[in-house]
């Protein structure tokens, strides 16, 4: 799938950017509200869910390629996300942001043949980390 159909590419982009809506909404609420505890927790929870989702991409690829090493690695993001939920958002949000960056570096090396995917993942990861960072500033 080095050259996806235009429909697949558009759908991946549309759904990827749609996944940013909770981060954008959460960040806006963090800026606007005086009491941000509930919003910070919601952002943290959503970041953990999305981190798990991004890790699951590797699970799918491992199943497709029969790569047991990649399959074993694919559960690490969900474990990091789960562990982060035991922390307060002021510590858990940065942990998930760091995990997103680490996962991005891995993806950029694993998906060399899929330039479109690398580009989309890079853009989405930068936006997610930026939105998480700005939200964190308002905790």
Each language-model region and where it sits:
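C-terminal ends of transmembrane helices
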Residues: 2-5, 54-64, 103-116
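Membrane-helix boundary connector in multi-pass membrane proteins
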Residues: 86-96, 104-119
């Amino acid at each position: 799938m080095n050259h996806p159909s235009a429909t697949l590419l558009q759908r991946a982009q549309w759904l990827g950017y749609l996944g940013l809506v909770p981060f954008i909404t959460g960040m806006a609420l963090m800026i606007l509200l005086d009491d941000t505890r509930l919003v910070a927790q919601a952002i943290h929870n959503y970041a953990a869910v999305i981190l798990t989702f991004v890790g699951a991409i590797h699970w799918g690829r491992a199943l497709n390629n029969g790569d047991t090493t990649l399959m074993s690695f694919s559960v690490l993001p969900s474990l990091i996300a789960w562990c982060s939920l035991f922390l307060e958002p002021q510590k858990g949000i940065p942990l998930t942001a760091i995990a997103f960056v680490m996962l991005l570096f891995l993806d950029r090396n694993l998906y060399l043949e899929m330039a479109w995917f690398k580009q989309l993942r890079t853009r989405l990861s930068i936006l997610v980390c930026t939105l998480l960072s700005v939200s964190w500033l308002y905790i």
